[in-house]
Each structure stands twice: as C-alpha cells, then as structure tokens.
C-alpha cells in the first residue's frame, strides 16, 4: 500500500503497533556484523524453530495468531559480549547466548516469564537483568542509535511504528525547502565524518547554486581501523539515514542520491537495498513522494576499500567510475561535485540526526552537547578496555567518563597510557587530557581530530612508537600518490619509524620526523594527507621519552618491538618438558628432557612461539 499523506502514515503506524502489541513475547536477536560473527544466525535459527513448535506461535508477523516474534535487530551495543538477545516485554538482556541456551530460554522466559540468570550481564558482582541496569548502556544518550537493537533491521513497518518518516511527512506537508535548511542551520548540526563543517551551511550553499541539477551523497566509506559506527547504523536502522537523505534532497532540490558504501560492509549493502525497495513500495522514496510531486531516487555505490575515497572529491570521482583521487579545491563539492554538479555530501551519522531535528526542533537539539558542537556523537570503543562496543554520548563528554564509567576501565587493572582518537589520521591523548571535553573544537586544540569516532584505548603494554609506525604504515599504503608531499613524505616518515623500532635509529631522526610531519601537514593536497602525520606529531610531543629510549638505550619499555627484546628461560620454572624447543622455528632452544632449557639469542628470531607454548610461565621477555 502506498502512503500518500501524513494521515496514511499515522494509520500505518497504529496498525503495525497493534500487531506488535499482540505478541505475548518478542525475542530480539542482535544481528549486527559483530554478533553474526559470534554465531547470532544460529541463535536466530534455533529460536525460530523452537518458537514455531509452540502451539499457536508464529515467527512471522501475522494478524491472526501472533504470540511470539523472533526478530533480527541491529547492534545492541555490547559487541564483545555477543551473541546478544533481548526479551520483551520483560526487557531482559542476555549476553554470550549459545544455541544450547535457546531451549532453556523458551521454557523459562517465554513460557514462564522467568529469567535465565546465568545469561545476565555482570558488572563485577552486580547482576544486571535489564539494559538500564548496565553502566555501559544506561549512561548513553541515543539519538542516532535510538532504534538500533530495538526494531527489526529489515522491516520498514517497524521503523514506521516508532515514528519513522513522520519528519519527512512534516517537511513535505508544512515546510518549504528554505525552512528545512534554516532549521538544520539553527540546530548547529555539524558533519560527523571528520572536520565538523556545519551541515546547514553546506545545504544552503548547494541550494543557492544556479545549476538546477543537484545531488545528495552519503559517505558510508568508513575506512578507519577499529571504526564501525556508520556500518552499525546502516545495518541496524538504515531507514533513519535514508529519511534524512530524502529530507536533504527536498531542501536542496535534488532528484537523485547516492550512498557510497565499503564493499567490506556486505550486510550494510544488503539492508540498504531492502530499505530502499521497501521505501519505494510505500511511496516514501522514488516518484511523487507522499503525493507531494517531489521525486528522489536513491542508488547504492560499492567502494573498493580505498581509504582515500573517504575524502569528498575522491569519493565522487569513484562514483563516476574514475580512480578515487582528491582534486585541487576550489571549486568545492557544493559548487562542482558529482558529475560537476552541486552536491550535498555528508556521512551516515549526519543524515541520521536530521529526522529528529525536524521533529523535535533545533532548540531541542541544542540542549544536548556543547554550544559549538550540539547533539551527540557515536564512538566505537575498542582496545584494552573492559567493555568494548558501540556508544553514543553528548558532545562535550570527557574521555574519563567514556573510558572508566561507560567502558568499565582498563582490562586487568592495567595503567592507562593513551587513547587514539580519529583513527589513522587522528592523535594520541594522554592521562592529563582525560578530562578535556570531546567536541570538535576542543579535540582540535589537542593536536587531534574527532574523525568518524574511533576510540582505541591503550595501556602500559602498548609501545607508542609502534603505534605511530602502525598508523603511518596504514596511511602510507593508502596514499593515492597524487601529491609528492603525501606520497613521499609518508614514505620517508615510515622508513624512519621502522629504523627506530628496529633499534637502528639516531637522535637526528626525531628532528627529521618533525620536519617531515610539519611539511606534509601544511602542504598535502587533501584533508587526509594533511592529517596523516597527526599520530607522529602527537606521540612525539607526548611520548618523546619512548622514542629516545628506542634510540639511545635500544629499549622498548612495553616489550613490543621485536628487535629490541630478548627471550629467556627461567630455570626455576622450567620443568624440562621440551615443548618450547619443539615449537621453535629457528632451532634456537637447546636442552635435555627434565632439565632447564636455554635460548640462544644470536639465533632467536624473536617470534614468541616459545612463550606462547610454555604452560609454566618459564619463558620471559627482557627489553
């Protein structure tokens, strides 16, 4: 049925909500990429089979006898504890669910309404039955992620049931394009993909171009290592992003839009395609949207994994079928973007904020976050931290609150060393900066960038020189090679960093590193090139003593750099089993059975196989 008016939309919402209410129980199985990798599909299949066997129970949504629904949702947040399951109406949150647990869940929870307590999350000694009991979840403010983990990720009906497309109906029915732009501008919404350019200003610049053929493009090319925020939105609630893009198209007069998604996100592509087809079926996308005379067609373009295609002009070049390479600006994308036409280019999270701004108003949005950075920000929290996963917090939240209150602190009580923010183009922040607010302007003052929102927490066992080398290796390989500064500058910086971690560095290397980093930062063609040296700049500034130790003392205090460590066997712990010698690929270990063994460090290749295979902690490392 095509929805032609706000009244039709409200009727559909009421109809679907009645269907949902008729369920005695809903089983929400997290079916984001992380949980699927942990076996969530098996959980879904097993629960579906078991629920179908119950008399009068159906897995599909039906009008006649719907009692139990088994639903695939998007990411429920606690990625490390998957597979995850939530049971309504009891609001039980189960973690680490296995196929063999499903029968007990059906018998105890679905049929009797009782919890399976061993599947609850535990915060130290505290049992947390409900999501609101879990510190990782109850200290978040969810706008972009509000539906992720709560609705069927493959059902536009469920999105409509929670108020989906009402913002679009409001726009089409009672707002002019300029009024939409004014509201987004007033909200202070800034692009969530990197530098934080005001979204309303960008839309306004496109709308006033003389050229009438315009495009709306979504950057879903999330290439930062350890970042999965945009992918989770596209997997868990693609409809919100699509609604935001449709509103943007109405505001700037565009009839075609493109979603640029990494080929490494097959689940996102699948669910986006489903969402587009469903929206077209209901008249919420395509020709004559909501009987308004407005047309907007949405297309998906799959990227080939090039990190540089996250840069605007490289992304549009890739959509056009050309090699993804940044170009000189001006003209900027708002003037000459896709196929030389004015183009609105924002990322997934930016568009996903728009429907709520339209419905609740710009003033409401500005009550969240900071004066200069209103709203919330999603982050992927990873690294040496107790609770890794997907979070959304108000702009201005401190790193200390995120790491210790939401993330649960560092694993095994290790000492905090630093946090990498902004991915390979970001910077490392230290203990003294944990209380700095996380917003665009504050982070920039700390020689870092917000980026797409990756947060990698590092403890005392992390070598910061190796961290800089790792990220420089990534950016050097991903450099498009168009400008000499980035192509050659990153290569030379990588060569110096590799010398230092190999124990062959000299003190003059540090001055050369700084000179090269400043040159690339000031002279590279595109934003990615300009930010590529940030990991080097920030680690040199805050961990210079580690660089000097590597060079002068030939020592890696974290015992990470292979060339600067030696393996030894403690004769007091060694029982002479010979397992280390059997697993040494270099034949560097000698000894007799039932007598302590010995490692010849002149032969040792420092692979660590001996330490990994020793069951008695007899092998130790010296830096």
Question: Would you name each region that the model predicts?
Answer:
Residues 31-39, 80, 184-206, 305-317, ...:
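Conserved phosphate/anionic-ligand binding catalytic regions in large, soluble enzymes, centered on
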Residues 244-246, 396-411:
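Short amphipathic, charge-patterned alpha-helical segments
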């Amino acid at each position: 049925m095509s929805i032609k008016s706000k009244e039709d939309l409200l009727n559909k919402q009421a109809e679907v909500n009645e269907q949902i209410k008729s369920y005695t129980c809903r089983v929400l199985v997290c079916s984001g990429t992380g949980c699927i990798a942990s076996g969530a599909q098996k959980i879904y299949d097993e629960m579906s089979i078991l629920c179908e066997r119950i008399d009068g129970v159906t897995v599909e949504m039906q009008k006649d006898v719907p009692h139990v629904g088994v639903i695939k949702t998007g990411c429920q947040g606690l990625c490390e504890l998957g597979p995850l399951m939530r049971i309504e109406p009891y609001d039980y949150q189960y973690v680490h669910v296995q196929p063999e647990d499903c029968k007990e869940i059906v018998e105890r929870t679905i049929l009797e309404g009782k919890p399976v307590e061993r599947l609850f999350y535990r915060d130290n000694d505290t049992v947390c039955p409900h999501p609101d009991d879990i510190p990782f979840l109850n200290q978040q403010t969810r706008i972009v992620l509000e539906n992720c983990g709560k609705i069927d990720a493959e059902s536009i009906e469920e999105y409509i049931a929670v108020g989906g497309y009402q913002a679009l109906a409001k726009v089409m029915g009672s707002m002019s394009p300029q009024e939409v732009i004014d509201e987004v501008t007033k909200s202070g919404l800034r692009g969530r993909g990197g530098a934080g350019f005001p979204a309303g200003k960008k839309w306004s610049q496109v709308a006033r171009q003389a050229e009438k053929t315009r495009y709306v493009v979504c950057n879903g090319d999330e290439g930062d290592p350890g970042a999965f925020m945009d992918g989770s939105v596209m997997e868990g609630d693609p409809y919100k992003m699509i609604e935001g893009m449709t509103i943007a198209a109405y505001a700037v007069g565009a009839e075609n839009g493109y979603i640029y998604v990494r080929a490494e996100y097959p689940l996102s592509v699948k669910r986006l395609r489903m969402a587009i087809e469903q929206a077209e079926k209901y008249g919420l996308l395509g020709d004559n949207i909501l009987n308004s005379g407005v047309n907007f067609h949405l297309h998906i373009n799959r990227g080939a994994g090039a990190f540089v295609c996250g840069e605007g002009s490289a992304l549009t070049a890739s959509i056009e079928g050309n090699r993804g390479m940044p170009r000189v600006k001006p003209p900027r994308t708002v003037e000459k973007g896709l196929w030389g036409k004015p183009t609105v280019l924002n990322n997934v999270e930016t568009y996903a904020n728009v429907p709520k701004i339209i419905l609740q108003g710009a003033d409401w949005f500005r009550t969240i976050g900071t004066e200069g950075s209103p709203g919330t920000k999603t982050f992927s929290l990873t690294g040496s931290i107790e609770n890794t996963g997907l979070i959304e917090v108000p702009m201005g939240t401190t790193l200390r609150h995120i790491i210790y209150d939401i993330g649960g602190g560092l694993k095994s009580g290790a000492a905090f060393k630093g946090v990498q923010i902004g991915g390979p183009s970001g910077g490392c922040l230290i203990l003294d900066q944990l209380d700095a607010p996380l917003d665009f302007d504050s982070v920039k003052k700390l020689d870092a960038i917000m980026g797409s929102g990756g947060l990698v927490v590092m403890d005392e066992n992390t070598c910061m020189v190796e961290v800089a080398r790792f990220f420089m290796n990534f950016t050097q390989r991903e450099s498009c090679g168009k400008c000499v500064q980035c192509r050659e500058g990153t290569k030379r910086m990588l060569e110096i960093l590799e010398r230092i971690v190999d124990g062959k560095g000299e003190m003059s290397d540090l001055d050369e590193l700084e000179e090269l980093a400043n040159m690339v930062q000031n002279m590279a063609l595109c934003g990615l090139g300009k930010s590529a040296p940030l990991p080097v700049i920030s680690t040199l500034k805050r961990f210079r003593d580690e660089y000097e130790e590597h060079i002068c003392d030939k020592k890696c205090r974290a015992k990470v750099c292979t060339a600067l460590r030696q393996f030894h066997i403690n004769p007091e712990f060694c029982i002479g089993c010979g397992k280390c010698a059997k697993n040494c690929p270099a034949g560097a270990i000698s000894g007799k059975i039932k007598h302590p063994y010995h490692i010849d460090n002149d032969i040792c290749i420092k692979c660590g196989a001996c330490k990994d295979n020793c069951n008695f902690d007899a092998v130790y490392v010296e830096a």
